[in-house]
Every structure is written in structure tokens, then in C-alpha cells.
Amino acid sequence: MDGAVLACTDGAVLPVSQVFDAIRELGNGGLEQWDPLVLTSASLLSKLPVDSSSVDFVILIWLSIDCPVDQLIQEILRVLKVDGTILIRKSSQSAVGSFDKIISSLENKLLLAGFTEPQVLQSAGIKAKKPSWKIGSSFALKKVIRSSPKMQIDFDSDLIDEDSFLTEEDLKKPQLPPGDCEIGSTRKACKNCTCGRAEEEEKVLKLGLTTEQIDNPQSACGNCGLGDAFRCSTCPYKGLPAFKLGEKVALSGNFLAADI
């Protein structure tokens, strides 16, 4: 039923003039050329005899004091097309004293049923629209995946030479400071020696040997480095441990120390 108008009432009779008055109230004068379907005693029907989503406008003209039942409003939502309009108004023969007393209840019923944009009319009526979405419908939210910003590398750009940051002072080879115990070409212990050189020199002096004899020991007979068992009585290395010729004689820390 394309471009159809459905008029319902809870009374036994519904004058067609009231239907057209309601159509004009909707601001659709062209609807007068249509043949509205009129249903009486609609409050007694469990289901409206109309296909789903087949009606553009539903006009409900009410006589009784009670508001339209929830089941009837749900049926009107079913038969209306998307963006279809429902108009509920008081009948001219209605026993309702003041429509304002039930208008708030009607508005709540329409919203709870799923209608949108309820609007109270001056002529003791209220209208609303069927939404374009289905009640209880759902859809998946698309998660926006944000990629990390890409770094643009310009291979044509000039590379910086790190050596250009070096000064002439940086390029000079560092010179190590002389040790505390080094004076000229010959190393001697300083006055306040803390490196152990003074103790070594003291041991050499007690033995009566020169520094050259300790650092580079030599032997005319070839037995000086073998130990006291092979040394002669006049050997300058008598009392020292065995050593290799040409290598510095290593003196132990307790050398020349008293046994008791």
C-alpha cells in the first residue's frame, strides 16, 4: 500500500472529516486525494491487519480517557515506513476533559516504543517519527590504526665530516708527564719515593752491587746465575737467588730481612 494513510480509533465510528482535519494538520494537503484506511475499535485488536513498513502516516483519534495501550503503539511502529509519522489527537466527541493531563504520558510512551522527535501540537495532539534505524540494531566500531610517522631521509644532503670539528690542539699527540722517580736518563728514587724504588736501591747498596749489575747481570765464569752452590768465594752475586744472565735480578720483599 504505497503512500498510504491509516486512521485508527477506539470508537465504533470515525467520521472521515476528522481524518482529513488531521491530514491538514500534518501540513500535507495533497494527502486528501488519497483514500485512507480506517480501523475502528483498534484498542481491541492484538495486531493491525496491515503489512509491516507499508504505511506513510498513521492517525490515531482517541475517544476514551485512557491513553492508547503500549501494544497498539508498538503495532503502529511496525506498520509505519522509515521516517513515517504518527499523529495522536483527541476526538471531537472525546470524554477527555483536558488533553494536557495525558500528553506527558503519551510522549513517554512514544519514546519508549522507539519513536523520535515527539512534538506537541496546539490542537490537542502529538506527533512523532519512526527512526531510520532499527530498534536493537548494532554495528561494529572500526578501530582507527594510527601508524607511526615515517622519517624522510634526503640522501642528497651533504654529510658532515666529524674531523672538521677537531682543532690543531686536538690532533697533537699527547705527551706523558715524567714519573716522580725519573731524572734525566738514569732513574733514581726521589726524596719522598712511594713507588718502592727507594727500597730496591737500598737493597742494592747493602749488597755492594751497582744498578747495572742488578739490571743486567753478567758472569765471566758463567756460574754466577746458578746459585751460591756454584759461585766462587769472591762472586759479587753471592747470597742472591739464582737468575738468568742478562735479565734483571728479582729481589724478594723479605730479602736481607732478619729471620728472627
UniProtKB/Swiss-Prot annotation:
<keyword id="KW-0496">Mitochondrion</keyword>
<keyword id="KW-0001">2Fe-2S</keyword>
<dbReference type="GO" id="GO:0005758">
    <property type="term" value="C:mitochondrial intermembrane space"/>
</dbReference>
<feature type="binding site">
    <location>
        <position position="190"/>
    </location>
    <ligand>
        <name>[2Fe-2S] cluster</name>
    </ligand>
</feature>
<dbReference type="Pfam" id="PF05093">
    <property type="entry name" value="CIAPIN1"/>
</dbReference>
<dbReference type="InterPro" id="IPR046408">
    <property type="entry name" value="CIAPIN1"/>
</dbReference>
<keyword id="KW-0963">Cytoplasm</keyword>
<dbReference type="GO" id="GO:0051539">
    <property type="term" value="F:4 iron, 4 sulfur cluster binding"/>
</dbReference>
<dbReference type="InterPro" id="IPR029063">
    <property type="entry name" value="SAM-dependent_MTases_sf"/>
</dbReference>
<feature type="short sequence motif" description="Cx2C motif 1">
    <location>
        <begin position="221"/>
        <end position="224"/>
    </location>
</feature>
<dbReference type="GO" id="GO:0051537">
    <property type="term" value="F:2 iron, 2 sulfur cluster binding"/>
</dbReference>
<keyword id="KW-0411">Iron-sulfur</keyword>
<comment type="similarity">
    <text>Belongs to the anamorsin family.</text>
</comment>
<keyword id="KW-0004">4Fe-4S</keyword>
<feature type="binding site">
    <location>
        <position position="235"/>
    </location>
    <ligand>
        <name>[4Fe-4S] cluster</name>
    </ligand>
</feature>
<feature type="region of interest" description="Linker">
    <location>
        <begin position="142"/>
        <end position="171"/>
    </location>
</feature>
<keyword id="KW-0408">Iron</keyword>
<feature type="binding site">
    <location>
        <position position="232"/>
    </location>
    <ligand>
        <name>[4Fe-4S] cluster</name>
    </ligand>
</feature>
<dbReference type="InterPro" id="IPR007785">
    <property type="entry name" value="Anamorsin"/>
</dbReference>
<feature type="binding site">
    <location>
        <position position="195"/>
    </location>
    <ligand>
        <name>[2Fe-2S] cluster</name>
    </ligand>
</feature>
<feature type="short sequence motif" description="Cx2C motif 2">
    <location>
        <begin position="232"/>
        <end position="235"/>
    </location>
</feature>
<feature type="binding site">
    <location>
        <position position="193"/>
    </location>
    <ligand>
        <name>[2Fe-2S] cluster</name>
    </ligand>
</feature>
<keyword id="KW-0479">Metal-binding</keyword>
<dbReference type="GO" id="GO:0046872">
    <property type="term" value="F:metal ion binding"/>
</dbReference>
<dbReference type="GO" id="GO:0016226">
    <property type="term" value="P:iron-sulfur cluster assembly"/>
</dbReference>
<feature type="binding site">
    <location>
        <position position="224"/>
    </location>
    <ligand>
        <name>[4Fe-4S] cluster</name>
    </ligand>
</feature>
<feature type="region of interest" description="Fe-S binding site A">
    <location>
        <begin position="181"/>
        <end position="195"/>
    </location>
</feature>
<feature type="binding site">
    <location>
        <position position="181"/>
    </location>
    <ligand>
        <name>[2Fe-2S] cluster</name>
    </ligand>
</feature>
<comment type="subunit">
    <text>Monomer.</text>
</comment>
<protein>
    <recommendedName>
        <fullName>Anamorsin homolog</fullName>
    </recommendedName>
</protein>
<feature type="binding site">
    <location>
        <position position="221"/>
    </location>
    <ligand>
        <name>[4Fe-4S] cluster</name>
    </ligand>
</feature>
<comment type="function">
    <text>Component of the cytosolic iron-sulfur (Fe-S) protein assembly (CIA) machinery. Required for the maturation of extramitochondrial Fe-S proteins. Part of an electron transfer chain functioning in an early step of cytosolic Fe-S biogenesis, facilitating the de novo assembly of a [4Fe-4S] cluster on the cytosolic Fe-S scaffold complex. Electrons are transferred from NADPH via a FAD- and FMN-containing diflavin oxidoreductase.</text>
</comment>
<feature type="region of interest" description="N-terminal SAM-like domain">
    <location>
        <begin position="1"/>
        <end position="142"/>
    </location>
</feature>
<dbReference type="GO" id="GO:0005737">
    <property type="term" value="C:cytoplasm"/>
</dbReference>
<feature type="region of interest" description="Fe-S binding site B">
    <location>
        <begin position="221"/>
        <end position="235"/>
    </location>
</feature>
<dbReference type="GO" id="GO:0009055">
    <property type="term" value="F:electron transfer activity"/>
</dbReference>
